[in-house]
Swiss-Prot record:
Its main location: plastid. Component of the 30S ribosomal translation pre-initiation complex which assembles on the 30S ribosome in the order IF-2 and IF-3, IF-1 and N-formylmethionyl-tRNA(fMet); mRNA recruitment can occur at any time during PIC assembly. PANTHER family: TRANSLATION INITIATION FACTOR IF-1, CHLOROPLASTIC. This is Translation initiation factor IF-1, chloroplastic. Keywords: Chloroplast, Initiation factor, Plastid, Protein biosynthesis, RNA-binding, rRNA-binding. Pfam families: eIF-1a. InterPro entries: NA-bd_OB-fold, RNA-binding_domain_S1_IF1, S1_domain, TIF_IF1. Residues 83-107 have a biased composition (Basic and acidic residues). It comes from Zea mays (Maize). The lineage of its organism: Eukaryota, Viridiplantae, Streptophyta, Embryophyta, Tracheophyta. One of the essential components for the initiation of protein synthesis. Stabilizes the binding of IF-2 and IF-3 on the 30S subunit to which N-formylmethionyl-tRNA(fMet) subsequently binds. Helps modulate mRNA selection, yielding the 30S pre-initiation complex (PIC). Upon addition of the 50S ribosomal subunit IF-1, IF-2 and IF-3 are released leaving the mature 70S translation initiation complex.
């Protein structure tokens, strides 16, 4: 009876995929991108459904996590956009702090 149970078990489909970090080098139509991986191979990446439905923008120069199938290593699914270290938001907040400091010094 245990033999039947073991034969019915399904493997996790995520086991057949490998995750890498990469850099978007080129934006192509229909949510496709050329991504340079850490090991300097360039593959074709497409946006996952969650990123598409969340309308997260992916641009050239963005760092992304990409999931690649072991069976076809020429394509991968972009599953996460990594945050920028030099993001625009942090620069904007520094500018507003500088403005506050200059206003305080004038008073």
């Amino acid at each position: 009876m245990t033999e039947k149970k073991n034969s019915r078990e399904k493997k996790n489909p995520r086991e057949a995929k490998v995750t890498f970090e990469g850099l978007v080098t080129e934006a192509l139509p229909n949510g496709m991108f050329r991504v340079r991986l850490e090991n300097d191979t360039i593959i074709l990446g497409y946006i996952s459904g969650k990123i598409r439905s969340s309308s997260i923008r992916i641009l050239m120069g963005d760092r992304v996590k990409i999931e690649i199938s072991r069976y076809d290593s020429s394509k991968g699914r972009i599953i996460y956009r990594l945050p920028h270290k030099d993001s625009k938001r942090t620069e904007d907040s520094k500018d507003t702090e500088d403005l506050k400091d200059t206003k305080d010094s004038k008073d």
